[in-house]
Amino acid sequence: MSQTFTKSQVAEHKDDKSMYIIIDDGVYDITNFLDDHPGGAKILKRMAGKDATKSFWKYHGKSVLEKYGTKLKVGTLAEAAKL
């Protein structure tokens, strides 16, 4: 079941027990993907708990998100209140 997360909730998931990243408006659990990431675990650990959108699109195409996204996506990012 998909959840809605705030940025602060995603930020809580930044250690070896639970690592989430944000890509666009999606929230992805990368905890069990670290060893499978072709670029290594280090960069994923550095981005854990953060918005990785710019970094992701700098190095990956749409096909990467299509391939892994459905397995890793745990929810969406809540819209920030606009003043």
Swiss-Prot record:
* Keywords of the record: Electron transport, Heme, Iron, Metal-binding, Transport
Task: Please provide an example of a Pfam family that matches this protein in its UniProt record.
Answer: Cyt-b5
**According to the lineage, what is the superkingdom?**
Eukaryota
- Cite a single GO MF annotation: heme binding
The cross-references to SUPFAM superfamilies, in alphabetical order and at most eight, read:
Cytochrome b5-like heme/steroid binding domain (SSF55856)
Where on this chain does heme bind?
37, 60
The residue ranges of the Cytochrome b5 heme-binding domain are: 2-78
Q: Name one GO cellular component term.
A: membrane
So which residues are the signal peptide here?
Answer: none
Q: Which family does it belong to?
A: Belongs to the cytochrome b5 family.
Please identify the protein, giving its name as recorded. Putative cytochrome b5 B11H24.095
Query: What organism, scientifically named, is this protein from?
Result: Neurospora crassa (strain ATCC 24698 / 74-OR23-1A / CBS 708.71 / DSM 1257 / FGSC 987)
